């Protein structure tokens, strides 16, 4: 591995441990030439995953889009950036564990809603209001009532 400091190819691994929910290996290395220490990550190369959008077009899976959407839904809520990242990790893991090459944006949206329902009620409703494209107040209220019933807060 090339040292980022002196650009020599002689380095040794001084520590190695699982990372990213066992999907990567974090290695701490030391350059044998200059003694500089640096970290590398080894990950499994995954097949590209395509998202089928509502209009039928396909685009590469982009976790940043999901992160942006949940952060917008959770704006000014007591949700940390680590919690947002963890939510997106869970969604991506659900998708990738299926071993498929394509998935609909609707299915991804449902996974996001499932995760948000457990994290924050307000963020869930905000996300649902965009994702589900409510046509009227009664369909919006039905979603709220369903969520409250699942959480044991309603009726």
UniProtKB/Swiss-Prot annotation:
Cofactor: Zn(2+)
Top-rank taxon: Bacteria
UniProt zinc finger (unnamed) residues: 3-34
ATP-cone domain ranges (all copies): 49-139
Spans annotated as Disordered: 1-22
Record has Disulfide bond as a keyword: no
PANTHER family: TRANSCRIPTIONAL REPRESSOR NRDR
Family the entry assigns: Belongs to the NrdR family.
Protein name stated in the entry: Transcriptional repressor NrdR
């Amino acid at each position: 591995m090339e040292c980022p400091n002196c650009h020599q190819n002689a380095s040794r691994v001084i520590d190695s441990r699982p990372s990213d929910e066992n999907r990567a290996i974090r290695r701490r290395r030391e350059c044998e030439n200059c003694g500089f220490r640096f970290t590398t990550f080894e990950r499994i190369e995954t097949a590209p995953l395509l998202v089928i959008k509502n209009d039928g077009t396909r685009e590469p899976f982009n976790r940043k889009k999901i992160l942006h959407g949940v952060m917008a839904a959770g704006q000014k809520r007591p949700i940390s950036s680590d919690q947002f990242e963890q939510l997106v990790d869970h969604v991506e893991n659900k998708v990738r564990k299926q071993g498929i090459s394509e998935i609909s944006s609707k299915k991804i949206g449902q996974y996001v809603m499932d995760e948000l329902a457990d994290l924050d009620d307000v963020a869930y409703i905000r996300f649902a209001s965009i994702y589900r494209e409510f046509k009227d107040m009664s369909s919006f209220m039905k979603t709220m009532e369903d969520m409250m019933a699942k959480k044991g807060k309603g009726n």
